[in-house]
Amino acid sequence: EILGFYIGDSESAKYWMSVLNEFKNRGLKDILIMCADGLKGLKEAIAAVYPKTEFQSCIVHLIRNTLKYVSYKDRKELAQDLKLIYTASREDEAYSNLQELKEKWSKRKVSLENWENNLDNVQPFFKYRPQTRKIMYTANAIESLNNCYKRLNKGRRVFPTVQALEKGMYLSTQMIIEKWTSRYANLGVTLAELNIYFPDRVIID
């Protein structure tokens, strides 16, 4: 479910706090896990508005930010190597794999510093079973939404007003929501797992 989309000219803890407070005022009582890229101020805002929320770095964005600075011929191999980090069975195994990859790829002038800097925000990820992790690092639904917005922008490069842009985004959002009909496999098992890690906070119908 999409709770909202926002058009802003800045990112800060104050800005994100206003968004999160709006969610709270609309009735969103709790957030179990916040998965996001390096949006400035978001982690601080979450800690202030929803202090019990577990914050995680978005694996998809970590991968993309790493591949962005790599030559095309090396991308496929590096993408495969990065799986050794986020599919590791334990945190210590992921760290060990990261150190090995750093040594391997430093010879090709590829930096994995982004992963080291975000390791604390990736750490909670490893306590979940592989099927639950896959839900977290697979961003198909979000990507389909972003692609829809990109097509909107490509078809009309200039919007006369902010309201015109908001209208276009709203219609695009409604169109993509209608296509979201499938459910996650073994959702009941995943909810049961979350209920163990977040007791009395998961509502299972």
Where are these regions (language model features)?
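Hydrophobic/aromatic-lined pockets within catalytic cores
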Residues: 24, 28, 47-51, 67, ...
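Generic alpha-helical segment signature
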Residues: 9-13, 35, 71, 75, ...
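RNase H-like nuclease fold core
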Residues: 1-36, 40, 44, 48-52, ...
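Acidic/histidine-rich catalytic cores and adjacent linkers
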Residues: 84, 88-205
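A generic hydrophobic-helix recognition signal that picks specific residues
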Residues: 30, 54, 133-137
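Flexible interhelical turns and helix-capping residues at alpha-helix boundaries
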Residues: 24-27, 35, 71, 105, ...
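Conserved beta-strand -> loop -> alpha-helix junction used to position metal-binding or nucleic-acid-contacting
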Residues: 33-40, 45-81
